[in-house]
Amino acid sequence: MKSKTLMSGLVLALLAASLLAAPQKPSFSGKWKYDKDRSFSNPAGLEQTMTVTHEGDQVKMEAHVKTARGEQDVNETYTLDGKEAAFKPANPPNATGKRKASWLPNGRGILIQDETSVDGKSVSQVARKWTLSADGKTLTVDYFIDDTRMSYESKRVFSKVE
């Protein structure tokens, strides 16, 4: 009887320890500023700031982007459930979009996959992988873009300002 109680206690202790050791998913919340010196393959003159609000499996991103072609505000919300959802792409005007967002394995970051179509034909696919540095002060967004003209990769690194 004592050995069963001891064994049960040991199993519970091991279970509790494994739960405490499980990796925590990062929070991307904060204000972020683009760091051009640590980024590559982005539009000339790119400047970007972002405010991210991350609660559970929902990420809301509000960005202000400046390039040589002008300025724009981008507001997007991602639900990290791995389910496909419709969204309205900025360009071309008659485009439709499908988006899927999910956690990376072990909660190391998030993956956002967009497909843009015109008249039912896919014209671009973009995958974005968001990861945080161990100290939570650097956000890296790796872009993988395939469109009708070319395929390329870019990286945007952001420093936390708040």
Give the predicted meaning of each segment:
Residues 9-18:
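Bacterial N-terminal signal peptides
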Residues 1-10:
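Bacterial N-terminal signal peptides that target proteins for export
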